[in-house]
A protein has these predicted regions:
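DNA major-groove recognition helix of helix-turn-helix/homeodomain DNA-binding modules
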Residues: 67-82
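N-terminal flexible/basic segments that precede or flank functional cores
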Residues: 1-28
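Short amphipathic helical patch at the helix-1/turn junction of helix-turn-helix
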Residues: 23, 34-35, 63
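Recognition helix of helix-turn-helix/homeodomain-like DNA-binding domains
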Residues: 47-63
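Short basic helix-loop element that most often maps to the first helix and adjoining turn
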Residues: 27-45, 71
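Residues in the helix-turn-helix
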Residues: 42, 53, 68
């Protein structure tokens, strides 16, 4: 099993950290969509992505590609920034 060290010294499974990161990403996208007053269908049309895929993404049942994230961000007038941290 692969573990990573957290800032507080705690060790957690890499798989758990990946799930946490994906959920945080989903939450940020969902928050922006709602702030803009867009439905999932409207966002999908703007991004060229089907509404069911937006729903799957927002429910956490979809592991999105970077291209998917960039399309949705662009449809909301946002940019994607990827950072790597120790």
């Amino acid at each position: 099993m692969d573990y990573i060290n957290m800032e507080n010294g705690e060790k957690i499974l890499l798989e758990t950290q990946q799930k946490v990161t994906i959920q945080r990403t989903v939450d940020i996208y969902k928050q922006y969509r709602k702030e803009l007053g867009l439905t999932q269908s409207e966002l999908g049309k703007r991004a060229g992505i089907s509404q069911p895929n937006i729903t799957r993404f927002e429910s956490g049942n979809y592991n999105p590609s970077l291209e998917f994230l960039v399309k949705i961000a662009g449809a909301m007038g946002k940019k994607v920034k990827v950072t790597l941290e120790d």
